[in-house]
Amino acid sequence: MSFNRCQTLVAAGLALCMSYVPMNVSAEGAIALPVPPLLESRSGQPLFLTLQKIHWSFDGKYSADIWGINGSSPGPTVRVKNGDDLKLIYSNRLPEAVSMTISGLQIPGTQIGGAARLISPNADWSPVIPIRQNAATLWYHANTQGKMGEQVHNGLLGMWIIEDDVTKNLRLPKHYGVDDFPIIIQDKRLDNFGVPEYKASEDGFLGDILLVNGVQDPYVEVSRGWVRLRLLNASNSRHYVMKISDGRPFSMIASDQGLLTVPVNVQALPLAPGERREVLIDMAKTQELTITAGESATFMDRVKGLFEPSNSLISTNVLTIKATGLMSLVTDGLPTQLAEDKTQVTSSIMQREIHLNDGFGINNAVLDTNRVDMTSRQGNWERWVITTNVPQAFHIEGVRFKVLNRNGQPTPPEDYGWKDTVWVDGRTELLVQMMQPSYNHFPFLFYSQNLEKADLGSAGQLVVSPQE
């Protein structure tokens, strides 16, 4: 029996795929979950974040030159308290200019970063940041105009945690790296030597491997009891649906802007780019489980991927959790009450229509830093109706909002609570509260959280006058 060249290539591809599958299985859970270093301000001392080139291994075999912060990628987790006044020193030791921001942090436009705070190579930026908001999981990242997708993909990101007296007094896991873990999810594409490959596309970057805290398919060992996971989708454009291997629901306790009023159970947990969700998992009577993020590539997808780039993930395993040893410090049931929300609408509500264009742009216009697209006043309430034909995430700086409905349907439990980032598929209505002031030279941005679309101009500028 003879083979032509095409049949030979396919046969070789099949053989390679079959040899690849058992290697994945044997290597499953072989890498321990890296926990980014914890960076806290003590006695008023400044915190330093150095943007630099680093060596990093995504697969445990090859080392690649990438970008990172303080020697790691993701960078260190910054932890602060409500009421702090934090001096933050960004030092740019990279060969190109970078601007940084902290998504979800409620601070004035003068301190939020962005184009007006571009940090040149070998220069610093040292804002003093007032922390005046409830406990929440946020994230800091590059948001350089026209370069955000590439620079975030290169490694300029990290988690940011705010604590307050409410969370301090709740019986929740809160020992960082022990029963309280940052879970930062990205998709990438690596060459044969473990070096990331990035190619911008109008549709958004999609990789074929899933990374958690910078590595593939990690495991973590925990004590028996409740485990808290702070989930962050730091991917450029990919949307995930998280599930637990034994079929149980996630106990979700917090969204982008902090604690929910009560825990909610969510069987399949969506996670859009830029979104954060805090969940609890009870490991008291479970030996091992795996969290996944959707459907992985099929056998034929892998064969096809040998001949052309594939957007399917080779594996969708996020994290394997293994319970060992004694019971943890937190073994009680979930608190029935998490946080109070006595917020009342205190102004008339104006409505805005925002359409995210099919290609790029918002309301048929691309970002122009010399143009203010919207004005409002601090403390105002607004109804934003977001529409799109191309599903994508959407983020607003300097505000918080609640999801009123999706395509006319009631808000699903996973969208309860205050947010700053939302997945838009069709029509989504938001109740927006203007929390902080911004100015003509230091405006807030609202933008597609599909970072490639944002880089092409799917963004606008918002100026919020200070409260009188």
Regions found by a protein language model. Give the residues of each.
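Active-site-adjacent structural elements in folded domains
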Residues: 212-216, 261-265, 365-371, 415-418
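Bacterial N-terminal signal peptides that target proteins for export
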Residues: 2-10
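C-terminal substrate/ligand-recognition segments
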Residues: 351-362, 367-403, 420-441
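Terminal connector regions
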Residues: 146-149, 155, 286-322, 447-462
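A generic structural signal for residues embedded in beta-strands
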Residues: 88, 127, 279, 291-293, ...
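Bacterial N-terminal signal peptides
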Residues: 11-20
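Histidine-centered copper-binding motifs that mark active-site loops
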Residues: 26-272, 279, 285, 320-337, ...
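C-terminal soluble interaction/assembly domains
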Residues: 402-468
